[in-house]
Swiss-Prot record:
The family this protein is said to belong to: Belongs to the universal ribosomal protein uL29 family.
UniProt xrefs under PANTHER family: 60S RIBOSOMAL PROTEIN L35/50S RIBOSOMAL PROTEIN L29, LARGE RIBOSOMAL SUBUNIT PROTEIN UL29C
Protein name: Large ribosomal subunit protein uL29
HAMAP family: Ribosomal_uL29
GO terms assigned for molecular function: structural constituent of ribosome
Pfam family, one: Ribosomal_L29
GO biological process, one term: translation
Alphabetically ordered keywords of this record: Ribonucleoprotein, Ribosomal protein
GO cellular component, one term: cytosolic large ribosomal subunit
PROSITE patterns per the UniProt record, alphabetical: RIBOSOMAL_L29
Superkingdom classification of source: Bacteria
Length: 62
């Protein structure tokens, strides 16, 4: 997900997407600890997407 795509979204959409990605991160971590996760790089990409969204949200609030 690119930052330029995120800048065009509303605050509500960004908040909803952040919540969705947080849930996905929880599920990925659960899969990692139960030994069912094959693509461990997915965790870091989801974390980076969450950080991008939080950055855009703080820019819009500021």
């Amino acid at each position: 997900m690119k930052a330029s795509e995120l800048k065009n979204k509303s605050m509500e959409e960004l908040t909803a997407k952040a919540a969705e990605l947080s849930q996905e991160l929880f599920n990925l971590r659960f899969q990692l600890h139960t030994g069912r996760l094959e693509n461990t790089a997915k965790i870091s990409s989801v974390k980076k997407d969450i950080a991008r969204i939080k950055t855009i949200l703080s820019e819009k609030r500021g």
